[in-house]
Every structure is written in structure tokens, then in C-alpha cells.
Amino acid sequence: MIRTMFKSKIHRATVTHADLHYVGSVTVDLDLLDAADILPGELVSIVDVTNGARLETYTIAGERGSGVIGINGAAAHLVHVDDTVILITYAEMTTEEARTYEPRVVHVGKDNKILQLGNDPAEGHTPGLMRPPHALSNAAHLS
């Protein structure tokens, strides 16, 4: 059986620009893409923590070290400058692969600089964020 599983995310990034008149996509600092194992052109889900909007688009590599998270095209109707977003990717894998796969989680802080890298999708590294009630850590459910 092939399953669609969580592959990686850039957690709680801040949107640096949004422009309705650009070709649709999301521009992401190449350092963040590399850290999250997301390729230019890869499908991403964007969850807007600020307003609850969810959408899918593809990535465009942005300048390294710039911290850019730029919402381009029609998505700019839903996601705005200074919104907090989560960029998520998924991958298809066999059940056996899924049981051992370790996702990449990139926690960012001010100016979208990397704070911490991890592999637990429920682990929070932002002050005030907690693990969801009853959620097991990756290590606990894999053993």
C-alpha cells in the first residue's frame, strides 16, 4: 500500500511580501528550502496561522539568507504580509518506509532565521506553544 505521509515543514514563518500580480507560487529563502528538504517547484500546502486560510502552490527558490517568504499571485488574496504561516510537504511511501521515515521540521524565529531543526511534527519550539494533548513523540511511537 502507498500512503501519503507528512514529509517536512517550515514552522511559523512570517510572510515578508504578498503580490497579487506575480506568477502564482511561494518564494522561499533557499536556506529554508534546503533545511526542510523542499525542492524548487515542489508542491506545498500553506496554512495561515493568522487567519486560518489553507492553500496549495509550488515553491520558487528565493535568495539565500534573505528570510523571504513571498506569496505570489492569487494566493495573495488569502495570505498577507506579516501573517504567520506553516509550509508543509507530503510524500508517497510504502507502509514500511512510512514506519521508519523521519520528517524534517524547521522552526524559524524572527526574520525567518532557523532556530532549530527536528523531526517531530508535534514538537513546539516557540514560546507558548505546547505539544497537543496525548500526542506521542516520534521516538515513542516508533519504538
Swiss-Prot record:
EC number: 4.1.1.11
UniProt feature coiled coil, ranges: none
Keyword terms of this UniProt record: Autocatalytic cleavage, Cytoplasm, Decarboxylase, Lyase, Pantothenate biosynthesis, Pyruvate, Schiff base, Zymogen
Active-site positions on this chain: 25 (schiff-base intermediate with substrate), 58 (proton donor)
Catalytic activity annotation: L-aspartate + H(+) = beta-alanine + CO2
Cofactor comment: Binds 1 pyruvoyl group covalently per subunit.
GO cellular component: cytosol
Transmembrane regions: none
Pyruvic acid (Ser) PTM positions: 25
GO BP terms: alanine biosynthetic process; pantothenate biosynthetic process
Compartments, record wording: Cytoplasm
PTM field: Is synthesized initially as an inactive proenzyme, which is activated by self-cleavage at a specific serine bond to produce a beta-subunit with a hydroxyl group at its C-terminus and an alpha-subunit with a pyruvoyl group at its N-terminus.
Region listing for Disordered, in residue ranges: 119-143
Primary enzyme class: lyase
Complex formation: Heterooctamer of four alpha and four beta subunits.
Family: Belongs to the PanD family.
Protein's name in the database: Aspartate 1-decarboxylase 2
Source organism: Paenarthrobacter aurescens (strain TC1)
